[in-house]
Amino acid sequence: VLTIEHAPAQAIPAKEDGFVVAALSLTPSAWDKESNFQKLASYARQAAARGAQVIVAPEGYLEGYVGNEHRTPGLTREKYAREAAEPLDGEMLRRVSALADELDVYLMLGFAEKRAGQVFNTAVMFAPDGSAALHYAKSHTMNDEPFNTKGDAFPVARTPFGTWGTLICFDRQVPEAARILAVKGADTLFVPAWGGYGEMNDQMMRVRAYENGVNVAFVHPKRALLIDASGTILARSQGDGDQIVMGRMRVDPKRKHSMLKYRRPALYRELTQDAVTAP
């Protein structure tokens, strides 16, 4: 396990088991997609040169997370869609795809996605060949994201390193979201985020890993955590400056099986009944 702050100087030795994840804890510039892409490319190249096979950037990284009304007071739907959002097949995302291809890595970042006349808070994972291996729209949003349409699916990606799923920021606070990904076979969850972080979040991420028997990579501009399926923190950021946090994750099928085999789904039907409301 290796935590690298600011300027990485050491590689993680290559091994045959598991895979090396680099969490890019970077603060992007609001509205400056070109600058943010250049920073992403610089840090991704450093991480890849030191053995990273999977590289992940935070929520809303490309446009600088401007879709939150606390970060951008007075934002209008029209300005957000016109100046912040990008289509998945647009020029900016093609450049990110090409970067994954160039570095021969899996590369994930968050961005405001323009799709079917709407904008989604999206995370996309490009595979080493540049294809989109995992494409997810944030499904749980609070009232501070008035212009983002909620996603309605929990996709998983089957890769040579295991089965992966993703949650975005507030999704992680909804236990059912992580659980459905685990039930669908995910053994590693990537969680690009922006909002809250700190000790309470660290504990919550450890619980999500433990209760589902999955690895978790939490990636925030001010915090990064790599956690194994037992809830142990493998690596974490130091301070709140731009940095790369690297560690090796391994998949233990026995761990996930032990967490899920005692479930009794028939007892949980009330969770999906519209008539059931919170007090």
Language-model features: locations:
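N-terminal, active-site-proximal structural segment of metallo-dependent hydrolase catalytic domains
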Residues: 4-8, 13-48, 54, 60-65
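Beta-strand-turn-beta hairpins that frame and shape the catalytic cleft
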Residues: 12-21, 156-165, 188
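Solvent-exposed loop/turn segments at secondary-structure junctions
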Residues: 27-30, 61-64, 114-116, 142-143, ...
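Cys-nucleophile CN-hydrolase/nitrilase-fold catalytic domain and related Cys-dependent amidase chemistry
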Residues: 33, 42-128, 179, 198-210
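CN hydrolase (nitrilase-like) catalytic-core segments centered on the catalytic cysteine
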Residues: 85-106, 163, 169-248
